[in-house]
């Protein structure tokens, strides 16, 4: 028998949490998005999960693991600590040594290249969902560029891993909007710095810089 989408997501997450009892907050979030994508949910499965954890699905499941919502029955990671400036989560029911936390941090560092890929893929998923709700349909995708079309408007979109990595050479045209999407961060300083140094220039070039809050599953206009 084929496993349901919910069962697949649960399986993926249980395996992850069994292997990483101490896990970086960002890694758990990105992998949750990835597992929802891999489950390839049908329309009815998607509606069922949205009733259970809210819309969008990945942030709702993530919140459940954090212990704020019992809707998705997964092992809780309801305590946290800072390691190397990063938030790591673990269960309050078990005691861990300094060596355990050091090992978790080393595992995280070795996973960074993969996590960058997962972050981009998750941002693309979120952007497609956001644009669809705004009445846009995807037309083409490739070379790091996504194109969308609505009844009387077109848009090009580019996804970046951070505000600091934005390519400033893009430009909007009279016929086509240009959207640069970046994730929100635990630190606001890079956004303040960008706004002071590049905000006026970005506005002159017609760029729309959007910020995705992946924990809430929202996208907001920045510049």
For each predicted feature, which ranges?
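Acidic-basic catalytic patches of nuclease active cores, encompassing PD-(D/E)XK
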Residues: 2-151
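Short, well-ordered alpha-helical scaffold segments within catalytic/effector domains
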Residues: 124, 163-164
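Charged, structured surface patches that assemble and position nucleic-acid processing machinery
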Residues: 130, 137-142, 160-163, 169-223
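Extended, charged alpha-helical interaction scaffolds
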Residues: 147-152, 156-161
């Amino acid at each position: 028998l084929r496993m349901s989408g919910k069962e697949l997501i649960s399986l993926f997450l249980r395996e992850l949490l069994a292997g990483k009892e101490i896990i970086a907050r960002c890694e758990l979030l990105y992998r949750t998005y990835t597992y929802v994508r891999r489950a390839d949910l049908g329309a009815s499965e998607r509606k069922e999960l949205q009733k259970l954890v809210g819309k969008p699905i990945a942030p709702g499941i993530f919140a459940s693991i954090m212990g704020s919502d019992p809707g998705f029955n997964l092992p809780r990671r309801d305590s946290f600590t800072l390691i190397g400036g990063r938030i790591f989560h673990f269960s309050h029911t078990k005691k861990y040594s300094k060596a355990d936390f050091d090992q978790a941090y080393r595992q995280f560092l070795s996973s960074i290249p993969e996590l960058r890929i997962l972050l981009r893929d998750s941002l693309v998923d979120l952007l497609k969902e956001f644009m669809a709700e705004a009445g846009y349909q995807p037309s083409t995708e490739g070379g790091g560029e996504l194109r969308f079309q609505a009844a009387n408007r077109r848009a090009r979109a580019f996804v970046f891993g951070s505000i600091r990595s934005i390519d400033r050479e893009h430009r909007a045209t009279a016929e086509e909007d240009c959207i640069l999407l970046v994730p929100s961060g635990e630190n606001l300083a890079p956004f303040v710095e960008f706004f002071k140094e590049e905000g006026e220039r970005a506005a002159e070039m017609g760029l729309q810089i959007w910020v995705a809050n992946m924990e809430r599953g929202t996208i907001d206009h920045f510049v």
